[in-house]
Amino acid sequence: MSNTPVELKYTESHEWVRTEADGTLTIGITDLAQEQLGDIVFLELPDTGRQVKQGEAIAVVESVKAASDIYAPVSGEVIASNADATESPESVNEDAYDAWLFKIKPANADDVNALLSADQYQAKAGA
């Protein structure tokens, strides 16, 4: 069974979301997603300063099996992308919850509350 930390929020499209002390959100892909993708070989992450809408495809993860879009879990502004993950995409396979992909300053902080809990994500994902 995949690792699904209870302190995070999740999307049905397999992104995890961590709310930081300053209200910004750190986003990555779930352990289940990296397992299904297999060896990740390339990441295309959004530019800092980009305005994104909830549900918009804003990044790409490529593995030896497939390329998958990563979606914005909330609307807001991209305030950081993880250059370390871009340089070492395999880090996402090694620890999906440490190798974050990008950070968003949400337009509406309450949007996070509509995301899935760990239990809800596991139920929907069949994890």
From Swiss-Prot:
InterPro entries: 2-oxoA_DH_lipoyl-BS, Biotin_lipoyl, GCV_H, GCV_H/Fam206, GCV_H_sub, Single_hybrid_motif
Domain Lipoyl-binding: 24-105
Named cofactor requirement(s): (R)-lipoate
RNA-binding keyword on record: no
Chain positions with N6-lipoyllysine modification: K65
Cofactor descriptive note: Binds 1 lipoyl cofactor covalently.
Keywords: Lipoyl
PROSITE patterns cross-referenced by the UniProt entry: BIOTINYL_LIPOYL (PS50968), LIPOYL (PS00189)
One GO BP: glycine decarboxylation via glycine cleavage system
Classification via SUPFAM superfamilies: Single hybrid motif (SSF51230)
Recorded family membership: Belongs to the GcvH family.
HAMAP family referenced in this protein's UniProt entry, alphabetically: GcvH
Subunit structure and binding partners: The glycine cleavage system is composed of four proteins: P, T, L and H.
Protein name as it appears in the record: Glycine cleavage system H protein
Organism: Ralstonia nicotianae (strain ATCC BAA-1114 / GMI1000)
